[in-house]
């Protein structure tokens, strides 16, 4: 059984026991969160209607809070000697899917 959930502006296909890295969700490691909205559930039959999906919940446990890979940014303007180098690491949360009900 799997579900498609939306969090942090992205959609993820999850099944029970999966580890998923998503955009930062507030909470301490070990705490549980509910992932909403659920967009689709596939068990014995596929459910995609809003009335059916209101009854479905996907629960997850926060495994760790961390940072994603570093992205290097280089700004450059020719003929002026202007150079600027920046870096960015997006905060991410690792979740373990504990149940789809």
Swiss-Prot record:
Coiled-coil boundaries: none
InterPro entries for this protein: bL21-like (IPR028909), bL21-like_sf (IPR036164), Ribosomal_bL21 (IPR001787), Ribosomal_bL21_CS (IPR018258)
GO annotation, cellular component aspect: cytoplasm; ribonucleoprotein complex; ribosome
The keyword Ribonucleoprotein is annotated on this UniProt entry: yes
Keyword entries, A-Z: Ribonucleoprotein, Ribosomal protein, RNA-binding, rRNA-binding
Pfam families noted in UniProt: Ribosomal_L21p (PF00829)
MF terms in GO: rRNA binding; structural constituent of ribosome
GO terms classed as biological process: translation
Subunit annotation: Part of the 50S ribosomal subunit. Contacts protein L20.
Protein family per UniProt: Belongs to the bacterial ribosomal protein bL21 family.
Function: This protein binds to 23S rRNA in the presence of protein L20.
UniProt xrefs under NCBIfam families: L21
Protein name: Large ribosomal subunit protein bL21
Species of origin: Corynebacterium aurimucosum (strain ATCC 700975 / DSM 44827 / CIP 107346 / CN-1) (Corynebacterium nigricans)
Top-level taxonomy: Bacteria, Bacillati, Actinomycetota, Actinomycetes, Mycobacteriales
């Amino acid at each position: 059984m799997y579900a498609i959930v939306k969090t942090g502006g992205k959609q993820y296909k999850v099944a029970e026991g999966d580890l998923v890295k998503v955009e930062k969700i507030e909470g301490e490691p070990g705490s549980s969160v509910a992932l909403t909205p659920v967009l689709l559930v596939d068990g014995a039959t596929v459910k995609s209607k809003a009335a059916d999906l209101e009854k479905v919940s996907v629960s997850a446990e926060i495994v760790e809070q961390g940072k994603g890979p570093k992205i290097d940014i280089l700004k450059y303007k020719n003929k002026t000697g202007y150079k600027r180098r920046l870096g960015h690491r997006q905060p991410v949360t690792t979740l373990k899917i504990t149940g789809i009900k």
